[in-house]
Each structure stands twice: as C-alpha cells, then as structure tokens.
C-alpha cells in the first residue's frame, strides 16, 4: 500500500520539461519548513511521455494567445462546451502560417487526434495522484497551464469529494484569480500573489478546517469556498506609498 502524502503540487502541461519548477520547489521547501509532507507531480513530463516529444514540442512553443492548449483541454475542463473544432483550427492555421500549405490536412487531423487523447491523459494523471491519497492538491497556472489545471482539478474533485483543491500562479494574479475562483466551483482555494510565506500556515489551516475557513481568517489574496457565500473583497492597495502621484 502506498504511503499517504497530505499535499500534492502539480506542474501541469504545457510547460518546460528541461528543468524543474522553481515555484513549486520553493513551495515544497516552505511546506517542509512548516512540518508538512508534500510531493511534486510533474504532469508536464507525463504528458510528454503520453503524446511523444514530436507533438509536445510544438505545443510548448505555441504562443499562449493562440489558445491551442486551451482548446485541447477545454473538452475536459468544460464538458458542456463544444465549439466548432474545424472553425477554430481554420483560424489557428490562418494566424500561424508555419502550419499552412503542404501537410495541413495531416496537421489538422493530428490536432484532432491529440484532443481526443486528453480525457485519457487526465484520467491517468488523476489515478497517479489519487494513489498518493492526498488531502489536498494544488496546481500551478502560468501561461498555457490554466485550462489543463482546471481540467485536472475538476476530474479530481469529481472522483474524490473530500479532496481540497488549490490553484495559484501568474494566471491567478488579482482579478484573474478572483474570476477563476468565482466561476469554477471545483477550485476550492485560489492564491493570488506570492505564496511562499503563507502556504505553510494556510495548508495547516485547510488540513484542520477543510473548506470552512471564514474569509476573515484567510491571508490577503487567498479566496476560499466561504467567499462564494459571503462575497469577495473589494480591490484594495496595501501600500498607499506605491500609489502613483
């Protein structure tokens, strides 16, 4: 039987596979200093193994604004939303001339094939994470990781009702973090801003109180389930000396 790990931090695709995640490494160190056991799951590397480097490379190099990775994972993150696939790919090819011309039909078919594999990948990843019997799972969200992270956390929350989910990273800054939390109820906690100093106490509090932490007890920039009932704080500036004159 595997040994339970209270906290799993997940580095979702699509992100660089040449180096470990500095951000998650810092969080793991902070959790260790707080007396909490955690592990980092490099799901970006699992995805490379799942689809192969020939397909992973172009996804890693695709500009985030093209939303190609979002499109690939959207069917799992938002199962009720099914856009016209060929219309999206037409626009993508139009905006990305490198994919146009000879072989475009094959590239189109390959992207559709990759999209059909995402459900299996998310299930496989969820199996590997749940085997660790975590109490909470946190996903990073930088650049193209946002929708893949939403897809995984949704699947995990469906399969383990007691599991507490967290999200943080550059895509969760300010109003982006608040909007993510408000619109996606399967994400229990969103951390907006640097988490190094607060992650230890926050995770201890979550382990003790689960989803029932009152807004007043949460650190600045952290949104929890109780915010959905009590309301979200108004935007504020902590350091008035930094306000432009």
Outline where the language-model segments fall.
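N-terminal pre-triad scaffold of radical SAM enzymes
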Residues: 10-13, 85
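Glycine-rich beta-alpha loop elements in corrinoid/cobalamin-binding modules
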Residues: 6, 14-17, 21-47, 103, ...
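Polynucleotide-recognition surfaces of large bacterial nucleic-acid defense/processing enzymes
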Residues: 236-238
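Generic start-of-chain signal for non-secretory N-termini
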Residues: 1-11
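Pyridoxal 5′-phosphate
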Residues: 245
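Conserved N-terminal ligand/cofactor-binding loop architecture of enzyme catalytic domains
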Residues: 39-123
């Amino acid at each position: 039987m595997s040994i339970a790990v209270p906290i799993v931090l997940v580095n979702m695709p699509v992100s660089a596979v040449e180096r470990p995640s500095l951000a998650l490494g810092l969080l793991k160190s902070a959790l260790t200093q707080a007396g909490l056991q955690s592990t980092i799951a490099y799901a970006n590397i699992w995805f490379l193994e799942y689809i192969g480097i020939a397909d992973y490379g172009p996804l890693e190099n695709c500009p985030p604004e093209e939303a190609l990775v979002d499109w690939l994972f959207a069917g799992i993150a938002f199962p009720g939303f099914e856009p016209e696939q060929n219309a999206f790919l037409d626009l993508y090819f139009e905006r990305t001339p490198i994919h146009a011309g000879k072989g475009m039909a094959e590239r189109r078919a390959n992207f559709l094939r990759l999209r059909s594999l995402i459900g299996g990948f998310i299930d496989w990843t969820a199996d590997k994470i749940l085997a660790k019997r975590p109490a909470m799972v946190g996903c990073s969200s930088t650049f193209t990781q946002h929708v893949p992270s939403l897809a995984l956390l949704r699947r995990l929350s469906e399969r383990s009702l007691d599991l507490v989910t967290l999200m943080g990273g550059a895509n969760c800054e300010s109003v982006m973090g608040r909007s993510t939390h408000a619109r996606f109820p399967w994400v229990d906690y969103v951390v907006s801003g640097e988490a190094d100093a607060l992650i230890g106490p926050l995770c201890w509090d979550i382990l003790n109180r689960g989803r029932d932490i009152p807004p007043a007890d949460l650190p600045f920039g952290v949104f929890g389930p109780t915010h959905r009932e009590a309301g979200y704080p108004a935007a504020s500036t902590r350091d008035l000396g930094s306000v432009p004159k």
